[in-house]
């Protein structure tokens, strides 16, 4: 059986024979000893294998040890013993080494030094071998597991929503189109027929799906169809935005967690969102201790304390109108001046959480003009039952709402926003047949990971980032 290093490090050292598999992180030598640090990615820590020349290493082992530089993949055999060195419980008294794959030390990009994030993005296929990105990957895995565990424990059904869709959930139009048409041939044909460029339109009825199709921006609308049959569901999958934003906060491909709950009003929706965030941060603090300690010391000082503060502080609830009134008291503090009807900017969100309320905040009842068509209209006719969960150090981490269950009002909102009702016929059917109050929210998975890890760029918390002019690997 092949043992992971994380299990070996916590096992009882009794001199038992064991094989260690992994990649060499560092090697150092004295006259009689060779020390090799081996890591397999299963945990942050490496295990030290010590070769003692006084025991009589054969020529083959000596030759292999010379080749065992950083990045070389190995199997090292020996006996597991208590370590005399400070900071480690066990080490391997090694007697044999096998090299699976060499790594030319002159060419291997990951040298024994700190590399910049920009450099590591250029070699995203290798960056998971570093301490930083190995820790990001493990936390990403744990957070995904925690998300499924949270919802499964509460009776939610996991639903797979389509990647290719004919609808635009957000109504923003910033979507990647999916087509089997040959673009060059389509252009050549139009030029040959001397069609007026201003009047030329592609006939998608002849395309693969018989209509214009896109990559999904959200699984919410499809999720609602199952929530109105199974009561509580959640989706967790990739979404896509063709937004030409080249910033540290935007990706063209990212993962979304979207629960939808029948019979939930905005009140229950807020309660679930708060419970969800607290659950995830507690999970990270308990299950990812070693990796979080690394991020706290090397990436963002005070990270663990910030996460604990969110876990231990009740979420303040206030309306959008109350938030604007509070922000207007300090209007000179902001680059973007707040006013009723504006979308809250990151600087506003962080001011509310970090300086006014000193903890997480849930803002509700936003102006309808800045929110999506499916959000429930309030009695005032001006605001909708939207909610945003804001946390210190980041700003918005969750966005959601009570959904509009009234057919006439929903049709009016679709018309008001200039959307085509025929594109949403099936969504409107949910209001025609057994409509119910229902609510939901969305959590951007990478935004959660930015928060938990303290990393500064969203491109560094996803294995292979997709952004404008960036589609390598």
Curated annotation (Swiss-Prot):
GO CC list: cytoplasm
GO molecular function: asparagine-tRNA ligase activity; ATP binding; nucleic acid binding
InterPro entries according to UniProt: Aa-tRNA-synt_II (IPR004364), aa-tRNA-synth_II (IPR006195), aa-tRNA-synth_II/BPL/LPL (IPR045864), Asn-tRNA-ligase (IPR004522), Asp/Asn-tRNA-synth_IIb (IPR002312), NA-bd_OB-fold (IPR012340), NA-bd_OB_tRNA (IPR004365)
Main location: cytoplasm
PROSITE patterns for this protein: AA_TRNA_LIGASE_II (PS50862)
Cleavable signal peptide: none
EC number: 6.1.1.22
Keyword Cell membrane part of the UniProt annotation: no
Compartment(s) where it occurs, according to its Swiss-Prot or TrEMBL record: Cytoplasm
Entries under Pfam families matching the protein: tRNA-synt_2 (PF00152), tRNA_anti-codon (PF01336)
Catalytic activity line of the entry: tRNA(Asn) + L-asparagine + ATP = L-asparaginyl-tRNA(Asn) + AMP + diphosphate + H(+)
Source taxon at top rank: Bacteria
UniProtKB keywords: Aminoacyl-tRNA synthetase, ATP-binding, Cytoplasm, Ligase, Nucleotide-binding, Protein biosynthesis
GO biological process, one term: asparaginyl-tRNA aminoacylation
Family label: Belongs to the class-II aminoacyl-tRNA synthetase family.
UniProt subunit comment: Homodimer.
NCBIfam families from the UniProt entry: asnS (TIGR00457), PRK03932.1 (NF003037)
Protein's UniProt name: Asparagine--tRNA ligase
